[in-house]
Amino acid sequence: MADETYVYVGAEAHGLYRKQASATHWEQLTNGMPPMPQVRPIAIHPQHPEVLFVGTQRGVYRSQDRGDHWQRMHLPEGRTVWSLQFHPHEPQIMFLGTEGSEVYTSNDTGETWHYLSTIVNPDAVQMAFATRILGLAIEPPNPNHMYAALEVGGAARSADGGKSWELVNRYFNGNVDLMDLHGVALGSPRADVVCIANRVGVWRSRDRGNSWENLHLEKFSPIAYSRGVQTAPNDSNTFYACVGKDFGSAAGGVLRSTDLGETWQRFDRGVTPDSTTFGIAINARHPEQVYFCTRRGQVFGTHDDGASWTEHRLPESAMNVISIACA
């Protein structure tokens, strides 16, 4: 079917999986991928859903046939890619973030990539890995305004299209739980409301990062540790948050807010995730279709805006699942 929805899931062990929404089995996608790929972000072209990108420990790969074949794009060796983002109006322009907090850009739909900047935070929490850019967000009304979520380095913003960055961590410095950011999303018609996900939950800024407020997910859910936050493609006042008890917990879920984060409701009603939710995907063409994945390989999908859910469990070989996309 020409309008069939495809779902893609990335794992840090055993790579990338695909299934059609109506199919019963997952396919592992390996043709052209590196050996033992560790797949992090998955990005689907907003105008051509057959074109998709994944970030791995060996750089960025592109497919032009929904994942049947893959080709490594031109990015300097040794770059582990943790985030991918399309320009909101010119999808031939793309951005990616790496482990090491480097930002690269492409002007030819990912064919070639050019170094843009490094986000330096002297107050970043020292971990066993270099600071990673786990999320990038771009303001549609003014694409020069960008935001980055750093693990474990807090939040940063740019006013010149990613060429330079300003840290916006006055409320977070010195607190590892608050500096450990996992995602960033923009809301409101002006895209001036910024939400970030961290170990404590979801925090919001109404002034582009000058100040932050804790949205206190614990008031609405017994689990509040957040692995990501996304804006609905059809409603800039709606956010989704991936939650769990902690990184490796045996409970997960999805919360949704339709009022810019003031209140939240459990969106995944009727299902029982067995581990922390790590990713959520909303079909931009059909926003009533939503999928989410858990760390241990569960995938749940709804085609009626959460009224009913179907489980699509991954093969047992799919371990440490961290990303999902659909179109």
Ranges and model annotations:
Residues 1-327:
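Extracellular glycan-interacting surfaces
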